Amino acid sequence: MYSAKNRFVQAVQRLQDFKNMYDYDARLATFADWPFTENCKCTPESMAKAGFVHCPTENEPDVACCFFCLKELEGWEPDDDPWTEHSKRSANCGFLSLTKCVNDLTMEGFLRLEGDRIKSFYRKFSTVVLQYVEEEMTAATKRLLEYFSNQHHCSIDLDH
């Protein structure tokens, strides 16, 4: 099982990796190995237009994640419509509610949108962040108690 630190690092890395995914072509490029390419609704183009990034794993080659709300969907079938599936499972996604192209937003509009994306990240990963902080605090407390115990040649009960 991953430690909270590993999950935290992975979550922050995903937030960083996805910051450039406002660009349709960047999202589309992630679908190079997408299993559905023609004669279906969930082509790479339609997936990228709906805000998805292809995030395959060894066991799940069709995992797609919205770069904005971080909703992961898998088990795609040829007749699945990316916009419909996305809105069914993440109706409050800020990307879905855009009324114009990201490139047409004002600086204020873009900053508001990016703020919403970061809020989505914290909503999804807040427990991971808190668990990581708690583990770090516990480890720091233990190190300090051990240090002072060694400095003053006394024993300190770490359980109380």
Swiss-Prot record:
Effect on the protein of changing T43A: Inhibits spindle assembly
PROSITE patterns for this protein: BIR_REPEAT_2
Reported induction: By progesterone.
Principal location: cytoplasm
GO MF term (any one): metal ion binding
BIR repeat feature ranges: 27-97
Subcellular location: Cytoplasm; Nucleus; Chromosome; Chromosome, Centromere
PTM sites of type Phosphothreonine: T43
Post-translational modification: Ubiquitination is required for centrosome-targeting.
Entry keyword annotation includes ATP-binding: no
Keywords tagged on the record: Cell cycle, Cell division, Centromere, Chromosome, Chromosome partition, Cytoplasm, Cytoskeleton, Metal-binding, Mitosis, Nucleus, Phosphoprotein, Ubl conjugation, Zinc
Protein's UniProt keywords contain Hydrolase: no
GO biological process: chromosome segregation; mitotic cytokinesis; mitotic spindle organization; negative regulation of apoptotic process; negative regulation of DNA-templated transcription; spindle assembly
Effect noted on mutating T43E: Mimics phosphorylation but still inhibits spindle assembly
Domain of life of the source: Eukaryota
UniProt function note: Component of the chromosomal passenger complex (CPC), a complex that acts as a key regulator of mitosis. The CPC complex has essential functions at the centromere in ensuring correct chromosome alignment and segregation and is required for chromatin-induced microtubule stabilization and spindle assembly. Stimulates the mitotic kinase activity of aurkb/aurora-B in the CPC. Does not appear to exhibit anti-apoptotic activity.
Family: Belongs to the IAP family.
The record's note on its domains: C-terminus is required for spindle assembly.
Assembly and interaction partners: Component of the CPC at least composed of survivin/birc5, incenp, cdca8/borealin and/or cdca9/dasra-A, and aurkb/aurora-B. Interacts directly with incenp (via N-terminus), and may weakly interact with aurkb (via N-terminus) to stabilize the complex. Interacts with GTP-bound ran in both the S and M phases of the cell cycle. Also found in a complex with ubiquitin-mediated signaling proteins including at least usp9x/xFAM, nploc4/npl4 and ufd1.
PANTHER family per record: BACULOVIRAL IAP REPEAT-CONTAINING PROTEIN 5.1, DETERIN
The protein's name: Baculoviral IAP repeat-containing protein 5.1-A
Organism: Xenopus laevis (African clawed frog)
Lineage of the species this protein comes from: Eukaryota, Metazoa, Chordata, Craniata, Vertebrata
Gene behind the chain: birc5.1-a
